[in-house]
Design a protein with these regions (language model features):
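Catalytic-core helical/loop segments in enzymes performing group transfer/polymerization on anionic/lipid-linked
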Residues: 1-352
Length: 352
């Protein structure tokens, strides 16, 4: 449990670190060490934990860093699919995530973040990053899917070595810069940014909208787009509540031109604690959760994105079941976080 004072300390630590890295010419929008979610084991997360716990966290720190490096080998290449209508010039671009369940039989896509169908937004192009690798047989021409390429072996170690050598050459053997970019989120950001820029160059986009999660691929893509296409207006949508320690949402390079938020308290936290200029924020009602689209949440257990202390959680849950009165509990449906639906660790935890 992190106290209020410690929350502020972490936020201030991250702010100062970002300033320091920018002064030393580190590309903070690309660096995995400058991405500080407290809900996912990134190098930035590990850095904060090491700052809090010191040497006690050293082995876990090293483990997280190595895991993020090795993950590059498991995600060596992403490619685009259904980029077939290059003659049509669109003015709106939506960059979002997709799962198999989001596609309709008519070839359209139902976005779960905006609660919008791809057929209902005029003159729009949709770039979807596939979470589960699904590509429908019937897909409308205004939809492009970015999908991870699969190979015979899960880990492409040759690519990992090649990536490291490329970074050595590109950054002239600067160990400091190499370590900032030699990680999965940095690699993913470069891949997505390259693909998105290539599509933008073939169209006349005036507006780009995306679910904004302050990930390196968000930050780096936005910064690269604004370098080449200053006239494009980029809108981010905060589709979820701010986390308890919102260190990843500090206003910084790569932020969208406008961030749509719901909830006056979130608006205030972004403005007063996370340094977002008020003219960059716009208060709206939620696109994602609407009164008319109520979901039945009864009798369900929702698992988080990252599950820590699995054994402890299972022991506590088992103890809860033992103490419950006979026939007092309904049959419970366990739901894995949607973006972790293919995670073997999460699936195994659910089965336990």
């Amino acid at each position: 449990m992190i106290s209020n004072d410690k929350q502020i300390e972490i936020i201030n630590y991250v702010k100062e670190y970002l300033k320091k890295m920018e002064k030393s010419n580190v590309i903070t929008t690309l660096s995995s060490y400058c991405y500080f979610p407290m809900w996912s084991e990134t190098p930035g997360y590990a850095k904060i934990k090491f700052w809090i716990y010191g040497k006690l966290y050293l082995f876990q720190f090293i483990y997280i860093i190595l895991k993020n490096i090795i993950s590059i080998a498991a995600h060596s290449k992403y490619s685009i699919h259904n980029d077939s209508d290059s003659d049509i010039k669109y003015t709106k671009l939506v960059l979002s995530w997709s799962l198999k369940e989001n596609f309709k039989s008519d070839g359209s896509f139902q976005d779960k973040y905006f609660c919008e169908n791809s057929n209902d937004l005029p003159n729009s192009k949709w770039i979807l990053i596939s979470v589960d690798g699904y590509f429908p047989k019937n897909l409308n021409k205004n939809i492009i899917i970015i999908k991870q390429d699969k190979f015979l072996l899960k880990y492409n170690l040759f690519f990992l070595i090649k990536k490291f050598i490329s970074l050595l050459v590109d950054y002239k053997f600067s160990f400091k810069k190499i370590i900032h970019y030699f990680s999965f989120h940095s690699h993913f950001a470069e891949q997505i940014s390259t693909i998105v820029l290539g599509i933008i160059e073939k169209n006349n986009f005036e507006t780009i909208i995306m679910p904004y999660e302050a990930q390196p691929f968000n930050q780096f893509s936005i910064s690269q787009i604004k370098k080449k296409f200053k006239e494009i207006f980029i809108v981010g949508y905060m589709h979820s509540m701010l986390p308890s320690v919102p260190s990843d949402f500090i206003y910084r390079s790569g932020a969208p031109d406008l961030l749509l938020v719901h909830g006056e308290s979130q608006f205030e936290v972004l403005k007063s604690k996370l340094d977002w200029p008020e003219n960059k924020l716009y208060l709206i009602k939620s696109f994602r959760f609407r009164i008319e689209n109520k979901k039945n949440l009864s009798n369900k257990i929702y698992l988080p994105y990252i599950i820590e202390k699995k054994s402890l959680l299972l022991d506590r849950f088992e103890n809860f079941l033992i103490k419950a009165l006979p026939n007092s509990l309904p049959k419970l449906d366990i739901k894995i976080h949607s973006t972790m639906s293919t995670s073997s660790e999460n699936i195994k935890f659910k089965e336990n």
